[in-house]
């Protein structure tokens, strides 16, 4: 049976929600931007009026203002974005339960086998587009095709407030003249490498030799060639599906540069506490840790090591990360941001080989203490109990948000 796949993309999502909350903003070019004071001062989203002035996502606020003097800057309100994301998903659920989120503003829908019930897929796509506009006051672009890659490509081809169909019979005429960068999976480095070999369009990618591109780009190159030829068989996964975690990480850009090892200690503990909490929720233990340091000149350095024992203890993770960082960072430049990642995870029920503690009693005590701390925070709030080292003027942004969304591209 031919598959009917939709890709729904909410147009200029953050900026559109802000204009929905404050209709006066619709008259002006608007950009949703991170905090300059907390050094997150980049454009997260912009409306069509700002886009017409050349404002681009991910550029600095200063750059955006230089292009558009009347640009209205608004801070992000992630709770509202999540609210509207969920409301849109409720609309999609009227047609199928196979809905795979791809970020807050995008979803794939598999409506295969529903033609007798709802009509042709392009009709369903247009109904969804109109319903979102009427009920939520937001516009979406919908791509319709026989696989996920082409459905997403379709939603990108015509914006805002549009439906684009890429049928199996004519997909070559529709998409083979498009640049490589238009297709999911073809990032800057991949595109640049293929450009060096004279491959610029999806058609040229589709027609290149399979063995050659595998040699040049590995499995990813072969996969991209398959995508360009319309042979993407990845399934639309339900919203509650999630791949087993291979790692758990957290990073932050500080409000002021770190200039000494000692100043990194409370920050690493703060990151480790988040990691420990998430490992506990997933019933996982980590056996290795990785630290990534980004300098003030935006140069990244990364190191990894084994943990002294399989653990989810924030103190053990933080202590190992601290020693790893201090032993390796050269301090030619101050540090702008740090990321800690715990990986090589094992299940909580697995037998843990204790190589650091001479007895398990101390480990059990630490984990019980960690559990008590988590319980207190869950019951009374995150700020009710802290490690003393976190009271030393930690230069961490006041606002932190972690958004976890399911969704995977799986070939079966």
Question: What spans do the regions from the language model cover?
Answer:
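Gly/Gly-Pro- and Ser/Thr-rich, intrinsically disordered tail segments characteristic of DNA damage-repair
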Residues: 1-226, 236-239, 277, 360-412
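Short, hydrophobic beta-strand segments
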Residues: 108-113, 302-306, 352-358
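A generic structural signal for short beta-strands and their flanking turns/coil linkers
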Residues: 26-28, 69, 138, 285-287, ...
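Short, well-ordered strand-loop elements centered on a beta-strand within folded domains, enriched
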Residues: 43-44, 163-164, 300-304, 351-353
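Short, charged/polar surface micro-motifs in flexible loops or helix N-caps
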Residues: 13, 36-39, 296-300, 345-349
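A glycine-rich phosphate-binding loop feature that marks nucleotide/adenosyl-phosphate handling sites
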Residues: 146-149, 227-230, 285-296, 335-346, ...
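DNA-contacting surface of Y-family translesion DNA polymerases
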Residues: 7, 182, 190-335
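C-terminal hydrophobic structural anchor segments
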Residues: 316, 322-379
């Amino acid at each position: 049976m031919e598959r009917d796949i939709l890709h729904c993309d909410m147009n200029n999502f953050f900026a559109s929600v802000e204009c929905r909350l404050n209709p006066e903003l619709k008259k002006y070019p608007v950009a949703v931007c991170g905090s300059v004071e907390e050094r997150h001062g980049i454009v997260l989203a912009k409306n069509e009026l700002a886009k017409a002035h050349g404002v681009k996502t991910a550029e600095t606020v200063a750059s955006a203002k230089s292009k558009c003097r009347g640009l209205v800057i608004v801070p992000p309100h992630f709770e509202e974005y999540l609210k509207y994301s969920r409301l849109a998903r409720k609309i999609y659920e009227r047609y199928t339960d196979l809905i795979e989120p791809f970020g807050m503003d995008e979803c794939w829908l598999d409506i295969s086998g529903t033609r007798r019930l709802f009509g042709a897929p392009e009709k369903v796509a247009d109904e969804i587009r109109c319903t979102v506009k009427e009920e939520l006051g937001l516009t979406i672009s919908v791509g319709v095709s026989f696989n996920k890659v082409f459905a997403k490509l379709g939603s990108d081809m015509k914006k805002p407030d549009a439906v684009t169909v890429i049928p199996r019979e004519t997909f070559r005429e529709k998409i083979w003249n498009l640049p490589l960068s238009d297709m999911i999976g073809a990032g800057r480095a991949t595109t640049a490498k293929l450009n060096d070999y004279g491959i610029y369009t999806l058609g040229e990618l589709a027609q290149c030799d399979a063995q050659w591109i595998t040699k040049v780009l590995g499995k990813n190159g072969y996969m991209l060639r398959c995508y360009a030829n319309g042979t993407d068989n990845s399934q639309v996964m339900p919203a509650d599906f999630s791949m087993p975690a291979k790692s758990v990480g957290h990073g932050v850009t500080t409000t002021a540069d770190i200039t000494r090892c000692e100043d990194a200690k409370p920050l690493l503990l703060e990151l480790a506490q988040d990691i420990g909490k998430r490992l506990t929720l997933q019933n996982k233990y980590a056996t290795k840790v990785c630290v990534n340091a980004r300098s003030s000149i935006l140069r990244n350095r990364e190191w990894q090591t084994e943990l002294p024992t399989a653990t989810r203890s924030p103190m053990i993770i933080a202590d190992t990360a601290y020693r790893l960082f201090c032993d390796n960072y050269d301090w030619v430049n101050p540090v702008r941001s740090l990321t800690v990642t715990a990986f090589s995870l094992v299940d909580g029920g697995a037998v843990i080989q204790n190589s650091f503690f001479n007895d398990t009693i101390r480990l059990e005590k630490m984990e019980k203490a960690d559990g008590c701390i988590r319980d207190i925070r869950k019951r009374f709030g995150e700020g009710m109990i802290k490690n003393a080292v976190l009271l030393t003027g930690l230069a961490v942004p006041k606002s932190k948000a972690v958004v976890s969304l399911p969704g995977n591209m799986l070939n079966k």
